[in-house]
Amino acid sequence: TINNELEEWINQSKPISNLPVIQEWDTFTIPYTSGTTGKPKGVLVPYRSRILQLFGMAVEYGCYSPDDRFLAIAPMCHGAGMIFALAPIFFGGYAEIMDQFDPEEIVTALKKEHITGFFGVPTHFHGILSLENAILEKNKPASLETIISNAAALPQAIKEEIVKVFGDNVLHETYGSTEGGIISNLRPADQLRKLQCVGQPFPCTYIKVINESGDECNPNEVGEIFSSSPYLFNGYWKRPKETEEALDQGWLTVGDLAKRDDEGYLYIVDRKKDMVISGGINI
């Protein structure tokens, strides 16, 4: 029990001195890209972009508040895995970090811990949905409000199964990059209406698709995707040439090819340079 001893212990403590002074453009973290154009590059992510990204996530996903409980199943070495685990804590909520990926343990925790949201990559969802129907039915989560998929395209068959098992009002499919943060999101209402689509611009994000002539593409014309938002990185660590190639007057490209339909929804088509994605991690 908590009694007067706690107050006495606090009163005897000394204030912490010499705390570091953090400026908004200081580097928060340096994750590394997959290195599809050569050696992996360190991405200088400032505090400003990540904090603003957290507020954007709260607006878009609606699952971050002091009352929310998030299950972190992705590794912390993954940029999205880390930010989706930090978000609930930032807003005063709860995050339970799984020490390994075990589909049955995850669905058990979803129900037992009254989890309201979790983030995963397609490999996670494939594992969860491979469980026996009896296990899924037994552990049907009553509190779950938000599921977020990211890091690789979510196959339509898996998407339909997620909707069938967890409901038609919880799934978001998000597109983004280490350098640009979250760029677009396909909301629950559009999951079965827009096939192989990554949605519309994330809050405070502008998107344009540019053809080889340097002009904006017409609807359904494939081009290179550029994004501009408060969530961009500061550049590549000690790689000024690559930074200059990626950033152009506040617009970022990471070499993804895409198209937009007549309603402005975004579809990722290919990459300028090929890569292998395993478990949501670019190789």
What name fits each language-model region?
Residues 14-25, 30-71, 83, 93, ...:
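Conserved adenylate-forming
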Residues 151, 176, 199, 256, ...:
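Active-site glycine-centered loops adjacent to acidic/histidine catalytic or metal-binding residues
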Residues 215-220, 224-283:
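Conserved ATP-binding/catalytic segment of the ANL
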Residues 1, 41-44, 72, 94-100, ...:
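Short beta-strand->loop structural element characteristic of the AMP-binding/adenylate-forming
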Residues 51-69, 77-117, 131:
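Conserved AMP-binding/adenylation subdomain of ANL enzymes
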Residues 90, 115-120, 129-193, 206:
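Gly/Ser/Thr-rich phosphate-binding loop
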Residues 1-24, 131-134:
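ANL superfamily adenylate-forming
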Residues 27, 33-36, 70, 76, ...:
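Conserved S/T- and glycine-rich ATP-binding loop of Class I adenylate-forming
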